Regions:
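Signal-transmission linkers at sensory-effector interfaces
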Residues: 1-18, 153-158
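Amphipathic alpha-helical regulatory segments at dimerization interfaces
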Residues: 8-12, 21-30, 71, 96, ...
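GAF sensory/regulatory domain recognition
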Residues: 25-31, 35-72
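Short coil/loop residues immediately preceding or within conserved phosphate-binding loops
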Residues: 33, 92, 105, 117
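Regulatory sensory and allosteric helical modules in signal-transduction proteins
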Residues: 56-98, 106
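A short, aliphatic-rich beta-strand micro-motif
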Residues: 103-111
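Sensory-domain boundary capping and coupling elements
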Residues: 110-126
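Regulatory loop-to-helix N-cap segments in sensory/regulatory domains
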Residues: 124-143, 150-157
Length: 158
């Protein structure tokens, strides 16, 4: 997984935003991830999806709320091994999980100039939940961070 994430990071750093989608598809394929959504701040509209969602993820405004962001750790990672665990507190997010048969998810909040600009979500479909191991989390985090860094450079040039 270290070799995979390193190769994908190099691909992003060398190819820029033009290869970001290709890199995400390869990451998903090699790590058996079924779906990926990017929510763009501040509206948290679905900006990009990869995978086969039964229902378009739509807007998840609560993802930008301080209360929800407090669920993320110091590295801006939110591990959801069982999506039912957030049903009571965040029914809108849980409804998205339920409609798309998502059992487990991994979310990364990305900052640009200290402000939230996107949340990347990686999903596992089906009843078999995935307990995310640290190696998986680290590999995915590295690739997301590389894409965010390249996006920041791209954004600053405009």
């Amino acid at each position: 997984k270290v070799e995979l994430s390193t190769n994908l990071m190099l691909k992003v750093f060398n190819g820029g935003m033009d290869v970001a989608e290709e890199v995400l598809v390869e990451l998903m394929d090699k790590m058996n991830i079924h779906g990926m959504t990017i929510y763009k701040a501040p509206s948290m509209e679905c900006w990009k999806t990869l995978g086969h969602y039964e229902k378009e993820p739509g807007t998840q405004l609560c993802l930008s709320e301080e209360k929800y962001l407090a669920r993320f750790d110091e590295h801006h990672i939110h591990v959801i091994n069982n999506t039912a665990s957030i049903a009571v507190e965040y029914p809108q997010v849980y409804e998205h999980f339920k409609q798309n048969n998502i059992g487990s998810a991994l979310q990364f909040s990305c900052l640009l100039n200290g402000q939230l600009w996107a949340v990347f979500e990686f999903d596992i479909f089906g009843a078999n939940r995935r307990k995310w191991c640290q190696d998986d989390i680290s590999a995915i985090y590295s690739v997301v961070k590389a894409i965010a860094d390249v996006y920041k450079k791209f954004y600053e040039q405009k």
